[in-house]
Amino acid sequence: MFPNSILGRPPFTPTHQQHNNFFALSPTLYSHQQLIDAQFNFQNVDLSRAVSLQPLTYGTVSPIQTSTSPLFRGRKRISDEKAFPLDGKRQRFHSPHQEPTIINQLVPLSGDRRYSMPPLFHTHYIPDIVRCVPPLREIPLLEPREITLPEAKDKLSQQILELFETCQQQASDLKKKELCRAQLQREIQLLFPQSRLFLVGSSLNGFGARSSDGDLCLVVKEEPCFFQVNQKTEARHILTLVHKHFCTRLSGYIERPQLIRAKVPIVKFRDKVSCVEFDLNVNNTVGIRNTFLLRTYAYLENRVRPLVLVIKKWASHHDINDASRGTLSSYSLVLMVLHYLQTLPEPILPSLQKIYPESFSTSVQLHLVHHAPCNVPPYLSKNESSLGDLLLGFLKYYATEFDWNTQMISVREAKAIPRPDDMEWRNKYICVEEPFDGTNTARAVHEKQKFDMIKDQFLKSWQRLKNKRDLNSVLPLRAATLKR
């Protein structure tokens, strides 16, 4: 996919191939979630040297050999999945120590729907002194928890379930994103050798659809030696280098790379092979933490994922699900759904951060945050409401019950709480608390016109759905299914 993803990795010295108890860590989930503690100075990055394709040497080790594969002789990559399986795409180097294929099966296949936690490959690593991705070894899979999708008790609930089963992200979709992430990480490590690239957001949190974009977080320095990156200066400088690298070295594989200078700057681009749109940020590590918090909520109760997906589809259809245009982000919408399910007379969800503070503490190191979903048992709610009733209740709650002027949505507290009087919250139309850093995830809604449009859509959709009890009345199913 990318020219430097074919670079090999030199064999490790015998001492580094042996297990070392000093560096032994708990099993980790991804090849890119590994403890890094070497120092670097991004201000002094030499881009001209970093992007060089000359063979690299590591001490007395032989230089890396580049592939002679015809796929990379200046021609566009062949995208026939059958002719070149995914597993094979990840091993294009001449090394006797090939890196085992790591497959993220975080989204269940159709045969895995009874599981709340799909099978996960866990890995651990042996640190290495050279600047390359350490070798990985598989360890036994975790046993998933059994869970069934809810029964459809009425027409509206059946429509919600059918839309969910059609549009939910598949394992094949996730594999494409993970393949791109792994190869991009190798490219970016030419600029920042100690960096790691994390796939975050809806791709991993259980709420993704087949059409979901990929969100990437570039961590230039991981914990415990993690430092804060100033998003206005350092992050923009780092992303400028990444953007330049994409434009100059990867133009044949990435299209439309664009540097967005927002509060949290990002590089937007599209992978030509998988046709997936990506957003890449720097050291916005709260996104890694909330990915696994949301994933735990997603699989805690079997009505959560179908309800969230249909609400995201509904909001997108009515043009109120686009933070770049002054409406609600998908993340804010998910938090709004979780908050509603927490505030019912018989709650469907609890506050995980209150019940399991040690699992969702910000003191948990990044390479361990993926353990949280595995440590939380299913939540047994006495609430037996159907999916249709819950969708109606969600629309009614925000149309007629929630006080937008004085209240803030808090999943952390599992209730609506008074707005803070800080500048960040003052004069804001919608306040949704980020569970980890306490910021306002709905700060993009800064125009009264957009706020009124959002409230109006909640009210109209609730009234229409209450009268007709047909999902088509608020979300045309044919159009929603075609978008997937």
Swiss-Prot record:
- Places the protein is found: Cytoplasm; Nucleus
Keyword annotations for this protein, in alphabetical order, are:
ATP-binding, Cytoplasm, Magnesium, Manganese, Metal-binding, mRNA processing, Nucleotide-binding, Nucleus, Phosphoprotein, Transferase
Cofactor(s) listed: Mg(2+); Mn(2+)
Q: In which tissues is it expressed?
A: Ubiquitous. In brain, it is highly expressed in the cerebral cortex, cerebellum, hippocampus and olfactory bulb.
Could you say which residues bind Mg(2+) here? Answer: 213, 215
Residue stretches making up the PAP-associated domain: 386-440
Q: Which residues carry this modification: Phosphoserine?
A: 62, 69, 95
Q: What class of enzyme is it?
A: transferase
Q: Which GO terms describe its biological process?
A: hematopoietic progenitor cell differentiation; histone mRNA catabolic process; mRNA 3'-end processing; negative regulation of miRNA catabolic process; target-directed miRNA degradation
**What Pfam families does the database record attribute to this sequence?**
MTPAP-like_central, PAP_assoc
Return the InterPro entries for the record: MTPAP-like_central, NT_sf, PAP_assoc
Instruction: Assign the protein's first listed, main location to one coarse class.
Output: cytoplasm
Catalytic activity as recorded in UniProt: RNA(n) + ATP = RNA(n)-3'-adenine ribonucleotide + diphosphate
E.C. no? 2.7.7.19
- Coiled coil recorded as keyword: no
Q: Which GO terms describe its cellular component?
A: cytoplasm; nucleus
User: What is seen without this gene?
Assistant: Mice are normal and healthy. Poly-A tail elongation in oocytes is not affected and mice are fertile.
* Short sequence motif named Nuclear localization signal, residue ranges: 76-92
Question: Which GO MF terms are attached to this record?
Answer: ATP binding; metal ion binding; poly(A) RNA polymerase activity
User: What is the purpose of this protein?
Assistant: Cytoplasmic poly(A) RNA polymerase that adds successive AMP monomers to the 3'-end of specific RNAs, forming a poly(A) tail. In contrast to the canonical nuclear poly(A) RNA polymerase, it only adds poly(A) to selected cytoplasmic mRNAs. Does not play a role in replication-dependent histone mRNA degradation. Adds a single nucleotide to the 3' end of specific miRNAs, monoadenylation stabilizes and prolongs the activity of some but not all miRNAs.
Assembly, in brief, is: Interacts with CPEB1, CPEB2, CPSF1 and PABPC1. Interacts with QKI isoform QKI7; promoting recruitment to miRNA miR-122 and miR-122 stabilization.
Q: Which protein family is named in the record?
A: Belongs to the DNA polymerase type-B-like family. GLD2 subfamily.
What this protein is called in its record is Poly(A) RNA polymerase GLD2
Q: Which organism is it from?
A: Mus musculus (Mouse)
Encoding gene per record: Tent2
